[in-house]
């Protein structure tokens, strides 16, 4: 009989390399369901534990969702505390054991004796085996122990950090003879170095031949440096991260680490032996709960000897038998164990790396998904709450199609025969679907208009749903931004069809292509999860929710946002569905009714937020409903694709019931699809009855309903609408009544059994009324044959909440803009006023931890809801300004001694776990040093202070301040600067990373004990003196007064503290009080910072030498030196103890050095606001910026809350999650008013294709009546005019401004007049023309005709009854949110007009006479008509029909004129006008001539009419057969920019019309062209009298220098107006913003953020390039990012202007031309655009810029993210763009020809060397060639920087494939473009891709020329990206040759060919990331550092 094998499990320790183990188990998990299940369960448990850590601890681990994700922190070396290491090793070891157990299940039962050997952390996985008898139990137990293991790792980390927080290893190993000498070596070292007990090194692991020494890294380093024996020994540093096996350190609470779980009571296997590493015998335990504390004692405290463990282990094995040794994870202990077993004569069979034999599939369970948030807009309901009201009121919301969508009457044809006919004019519509807060979502108005309204509304909807869910990205494991996915259903392209009327805009793709909707959502919210756009017709949103459900269950994401929208914008689908017979002709959906005749189209927007149920419960979410199951199938056997199929629907119900584990009778309600079509309703009801409600199967009828009867069929959004209604029934506990019931029901045979009930009244739907857990089915099907079905269940019953112990709370409100902020506050105030019973704690929790926060903020603190109401009421309406706070600096001020009191932190100690843990932990450490206990001084207000020792006071103060630092850090507040007063400096040094917490407490305690032991209390004391600064200074300098005293503290200019003997201080107090000084003898036992302390200094110096001093991580302002201190040592602390406190000097230093400013936030760390008073005495800090952490007479939470509120309002990011984490069991998310969006209307009506297209136009300028209404209170009408109508187009084309066709003001006036006339006469133009005046016509947005698109102008007229005034607004339908023009048309009394004209005539007669006399005497100018219009052509180019002026007399100063006018006769017989625009212009444009026809005015400026205050020109008064005169004059201008003029029209001796208040604005002609959206036409060359400046820069021709061939043309300075450069640059900037974004000028305020109006990096470059072109001012490409608001930019522009004026005073205001031989050189056909990316353009030759040549895509945008490359702001960095970046198809030239153009661009910017050149990717190759040519021309090249591209080969591959778009895509060259653009089909992306292909094609023909040895750059740098773009396997399939032009091999970071071109002297660097990610955040930061270092090496 064979001898049974004995099993030994070997678990190494936590220092073993984890990555091989991790990779192995992850790979094997693909084939093992058991292992896959364990890995996920273990990670889930670890995530729960990590969620409880501090933010700093979480940051070291990083976000993770898998074992490999956890291990990433090891690869990235962020796991400096070893937490991820220890957890990863544990999980990997258990994973390997699972694989072994699958191969041999007997391993885990008790049938075979089993011995486990583990070292240190390896004991924990061994413990899991002790309590598991099979794989299932092992997975269960080990998953929990993974969490325990994490706690242990964190405890090790925390204990270690308390001693020393710096980097470095905590252990080294020693081999050989030195092992025996270690105890003596350590003892001598500790004594000689005065190492305090807590910092001593110790022997943790030992064997006869080697040992491991542990200790703080700095101590170990010093030990190895000073010990001769260790230097000679074989000692090696180990990867150890903390203190283990340390008996001298305080042990953590093992009970807390073990935790609570039923698994802990599991009995241990009797045949299983686990040896203790310290007792060398099996642990004596019966349950896990007994075993784990013993294991932890061995890990944390007890030394171990592995050799002895292994030797003893052999005694428990049967002698002579074979041993199966299972190495569970690679470990170095294997050698030692095998040696031991071999010595004991055991035969060892080593078992490693077993294959998985598991073949069976384990069902993971269907899972459940929680709906945690909802939002929606529906017909008649702007929110989910309003939807419920609509349902309960039985409202049916159909109505006639609103005219804003399209004119239904134009398309209605009940026969349906017309090409676009609709058979019904009804639908269910949203109110105001065009409203959108574009600024909130950083979208420009121009782009917003192109966006599908569904896309816009879904952005609102997602935001609102997130608020409802309380979801803040990054706030929990399930809310990790990398794991949030978006699923959107959409089935309509209406908006794209509508936009096609108006031509194609640059934003049309991302605005109307449906895939952009989920992409834009993820982009805005910064989510990295997958995005899905689903088009399944009516099943789109149901399918989207179904996909989201499955993704959550499959763990493809952790949170999902799902929903969709349906917006009706055109008649197309109405027509198509009408013709298909789908639509009801009589109105709404009549679900279940006998008169059902089709469905009614509806609109809706709906969004839900989903999480796995367990995650929702863990995150304290409000669960609205639970999705238990989902199924989807297709009706494959139906007779028609659009016809429902009963069997298929039945199978869908059956499948979802099976998946959910429910029976039909468990379902109480069905939310049906219910469209109201006979076939659909009948089939759906039949299938429901057959599966869910068969006869005699139910005790109560199954209730059914359908939302479509209320809201119509919202098509793609129908599924989400039904889901929201269904979820509301759970929330409300009620099924709403079905609309139309009880009407006559349809004939449904399946309902005859009475098992189904359609409710005509509300039905209770509570758990009590249903009698069981509520569950329902939600059904949805689509016209394409798909069936979707969900089972929903009520949410779990929430647990009862305990009361929140905090008496004070913070409530926050924030918004993106001031309007929204005020409305948010108003809504919250109203809510609280109406709901005063609201829990204050829940309100605080909801507004802080569960809301997204914006830049504009308000915060309120209080102890009751009424406090918050009062604060809100006082704050509401206050003008807080538009400024958005940045991130101000935070200064921590640490309190010194004397401010203590009993119970300083009692409230925090009682309920704040982090605070309490810090205090108790520090006390434990202090006790080990022999210091007295002190925690009661902090925690107990009743402590009698008279019995408290100095040591207790000092220790309690230091501990309190350290605990506050830790607490503030957890809350997200870390200082930028610290300053400590006296003893407060120790905690300040802890905050700065100079001292560890343990060292700080050791020093404070030692210092205090020395005081107590060496000095007599009460002999000396301290006296505080306050007075005027002058008086105090005089006292301090008076030797007689200061006799026997010394200044201990300089607290402020008017306050010092003296130290000395008490009798002398008493005398001094009496003397100074008599001199009116304020004096106070302080209650302190010693005279600190005085000579009394000299006695303790030697002892303190010795103690201080034993601690480690780190380098400050932040600024430390020393109150010893009064300056910033960067080096600290023991001597510093000795001086700090003895010398005076220089607080005044320290604060003064902060101010003078700019370390603090008026915005700095001061937070006092200590028991009270002592130092804040001193700071206020030294500075002018505002009260709200100076905050105490604690205050003696205030509850701790009150002062903490108040400080948090101030910090929050100032813009700091608060860790609200951590703030509430200890109290989560007391808090609930509550429903509050949703965000108040600052909306603007972006709706555009559809106008094409209706019947009105054939109707005769009303007039030439006003074509069609769209709608007219008279409601008794107001008359209104809407008209349209089509610009392309020939007569109107002719009028417009005859009116050109500066060569650009612009619609004249006369056309707008005529439109307004005719519209008012139409309303007054009822459209009867045969009636007499009423007397009408045009009042205050303003033109804000000119209209220019657009070719290739249907341009429609809309005219809106309103007149209140009993009013004479019509309000008229005119808009371009392509931009309906922008008012083109507006005016008032007033019905006038002719008698009043006559009287007015008489007065006017009296006023102008003398002026006319005087002007005629001047003309007769030759003073005034007389112009005939032709000359008049020639002069006017400076601005105006009129068609012949406008030229009515025959002669004009113009005053000498061009301020007045008199013209003779003959009105042109109509040339078009079809022309019909109330008042012809030709006539209006001819009669009035004389006033414009005075400005624009003046030959003395600069041709660079024009004067544009902006407003006409009043115009009265009656059509009946005028005739082309009468000669008229017009007199015009200008008022004096106040600013030379704005002008006002008047025109009076005379016939004979009477005024027959006038125009008063014609306003003009002066602007540069270039700005006009920008506003009108046209390129600036070339100006004719002018001769100049200025001296020419010859360019002498050499250029190269065929490698030779030439001084004449290529000259650099310097850009001319901008033309100066009255404000010089600033006016020009600022005005061009604003004009560019208006054009690019579509904003109105009035909307672009100084506070406007460029990002929020849609200015991205590409648009920024475009704007700055235009500024350069038009003004000559060159700004770097990051200018609009560095100065993110208009105000910031304007201030910087003014600063630059002042510098420019100071540098060039002689050229200010002059034109400078750069010429050669008197003529400007002709510009080359192709030029590179050179973009200043950083710094300022060099002003002299001593400053050398860096030129970066564009990559293969050709754009400068590639370099936009580079950080500053100059050590200061002295380096100009230029990006040289490709000459073909705008038209890449033209890039067909050779490499040499392209390089010549780059060279010319570099030369033009910098004519002479030395040069700095470089480039990324293809730009690196071009930069090489440019450098080669410059060197050949004799120039000096300081440096060449090539970024991540191989050198072009000297030996091209003859078999290389010809480049194609597919090939370069395959090799990854387009990856960067695809990452940048969400849609790679966008015009910008397509253009860059085409350029990339052109570049590759150019390179494919390149054979480079190497540089000769004597002509090479002085330094060459090559930078490589470490990661591959493609998976390694993908490279095997690449076409030959082309890949050589891209990535280096991942293992080859060397020359890659560059050494063949530039020689061997190349410096190589590597940066994290792949080829494309290194150019974006965060990897670009590291690249920036490399480039900065390279540039620094090249500076001369």
From Swiss-Prot:
EC numbers on record: 2.3.1.-
Protein name per UniProt: Non-reducing polyketide synthase atnG
Domain PKS/mFAS DH: 1263-1569
Chain spans, region Disordered: 1573-1621
Alphabetical UniProt keywords: Acyltransferase, Multifunctional enzyme, Phosphopantetheine, Phosphoprotein, Transferase
Pathway connected to this protein: Secondary metabolite biosynthesis; terpenoid biosynthesis
Region (N-terminal acylcarrier protein transacylase (SAT) domain): 9-245
UniProt entry tagged with the keyword Transferase: yes
Lineage of the species this protein comes from: Eukaryota, Fungi, Dikarya, Ascomycota, Pezizomycotina
Keyword Phosphoprotein: yes
Top-level division of the source organism's lineage: Eukaryota
UniProt-listed Pfam families: Acyl_transf_1 (PF00698), CurL-like_PKS_C (PF22621), ketoacyl-synt (PF00109), Ketoacyl-synt_C (PF02801), PKS_DH_N (PF21089), PP-binding (PF00550), PS-DH (PF14765), SAT (PF16073)
Ranges where the record places region N-terminal hotdog fold: 1263-1392
Chain positions with O-(pantetheine 4'-phosphoryl)serine modification: 1657
Residue span(s) of domain Ketosynthase family 3 (KS3): 366-794
Domain notes: Multidomain protein; including a starter unit:ACP transacylase (SAT) that selects the starter unit; a ketosynthase (KS) that catalyzes repeated decarboxylative condensation to elongate the polyketide backbone; a malonyl-CoA:ACP transacylase (MAT) that selects and transfers the extender unit malonyl-CoA; a product template (PT) domain that controls the immediate cyclization regioselectivity of the reactive polyketide backbone; and an acyl-carrier protein (ACP) that serves as the tether of the growing and completed polyketide via its phosphopantetheinyl arm.
GO biological process, alphabetically ordered: fatty acid biosynthetic process; secondary metabolite biosynthetic process; terpenoid biosynthetic process
Biased composition range(s): Polar residues: 1594-1607
Residues at the catalytic site: 538, 673, 713, 982, 1295, 1481
Region (Malonyl-CoA:ACP transacylase (MAT) domain): 891-1150
